[in-house]
Amino acid sequence: MKADAHRRHAESLERAIALAKSDPATSVAIIENAWGAAYHWISYGCIRKYQQHRDKHQGLTAYLVGLGEQRLAQWWRNFEDVRQAGFYGNQAGESEVQEVLELLERIRAWATT
């Protein structure tokens, strides 16, 4: 997938988040969509900055560390932890939603600057 396609996917998922935010019952969906948007922003940013990206989310943390992007790798690791706790562990409340939205904002800023 090319950089612009990753950007469009991220923006589409962010639009879905905006539509879902008014319903507290959608916290798991918000977290999942934020995670997906973050992945696409990371791919977009890696293509822009390094002319390459990882096609899969497995191993993404190590890939980012290999690029020298330790801070971004930590944000992704945090995203993975919150996502798994919400999806598999029933920990998807308001604070988790707020955390992933803040992480998503940081990742989008990294990708677009």
Label each residue range with its predicted role.
Residues 1-113:
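Terminal alpha-helical segments
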